[in-house]
Structure formats: structure tokens, C-alpha cells
Amino acid sequence: MPTINQLVRNGRTDKVWKSKSPALNKGFNSLKKKSTDISAPQKRGVCTRVGTMTPKKPNSALRKYARVRLTNGIEVTAYIPGIGHNLQEHSVVLIRGGRVKDLPGVRYHIVRGALDTAGVDKRMQGRSKYGTKKPKAAKK
């Protein structure tokens, strides 16, 4: 525990808080060509590369990912959730925060069903997470 004299000399400092999705905390003023500190829940970007990568040690799969250049000029790696996708280079996508635990360096998710990204086909449960519309009722 500090003495009164030590507190007078140095005082207490706040803990430094670090963002888990830093690219969403930067904006870009295109008129002044300057970066701004404006946070956003999602950001739009253009795919520069779409591919697959393998996860960390105990898991085994081919996880789909896209390299995305955001509107603020930052390029990030984002995970494509769900089974099957229609993304290719130059597709316009919406990204949100949220890491993928077994893919190092992937801190963002692509939002399915927004902009150029199609929803997951034939999905019946958890549709809102994968951008799938409600199926039409079958005729009797």
C-alpha cells in the first residue's frame, strides 16, 4: 500500500484499456485525408482476397476468410461464417467485431445477408445470425 507521500508525488493512474477490434474505432475524413477517432458498430469494406486457412492445434478444418480493405483505409482479416458463400475479390461486405478463437489474427466477422454477401441457403434455425430470410409456407 502506498504512503501518503508517494500518492502526493505520483497519484493513481487509470488502467490502460485496449480495444479488441481497433479497426472499428477509426474513421476517415476523405476531405481532409485524415484519420479520425469515431467508433462504429460495423464497417463497410471491399474484399481484396478470399481463401481458406487451417485452425490452431487441436482443431482441424478449412476455415473461410476474407482480407478486407475498409472505408477507413485499414486492411483486416475477417471470418466468413456459415456453410458456403458467394464472396470473391471486389465484393463489398459489412464487417462486425468478434474474434475467431482458433484462427490467429482474425478479429472480425463478415455480416451475412448484408451488401454483396448472400445469406446461408436452406438454413432453418438461427437464421438471423446468417442473414437467411424466412422460408415461404408450403402449400397444402
From Swiss-Prot:
Transport listed as a keyword: no
Keyword annotations: Ribonucleoprotein, Ribosomal protein, RNA-binding, rRNA-binding, tRNA-binding
GO molecular function: rRNA binding; structural constituent of ribosome; tRNA binding
Keyword field contains Ribosomal protein: yes
PROSITE patterns hit by this protein: RIBOSOMAL_S12
Domain of life of the organism encoding this protein: Bacteria
GO biological process, one term: translation
Record GO cellular component, one term: small ribosomal subunit
Its job: With S4 and S5 plays an important role in translational accuracy. Interacts with and stabilizes bases of the 16S rRNA that are involved in tRNA selection in the A site and with the mRNA backbone. Located at the interface of the 30S and 50S subunits, it traverses the body of the 30S subunit contacting proteins on the other side and probably holding the rRNA structure together. The combined cluster of proteins S8, S12 and S17 appears to hold together the shoulder and platform of the 30S subunit.
Family as reported in the entry's similarity comment: Belongs to the universal ribosomal protein uS12 family.
Subunit structure: Part of the 30S ribosomal subunit. Contacts proteins S8 and S17. May interact with IF1 in the 30S initiation complex.
Name of the protein this chain belongs to: Small ribosomal subunit protein uS12
Organism: Bacillus anthracis
Gene (UniProt): rpsL
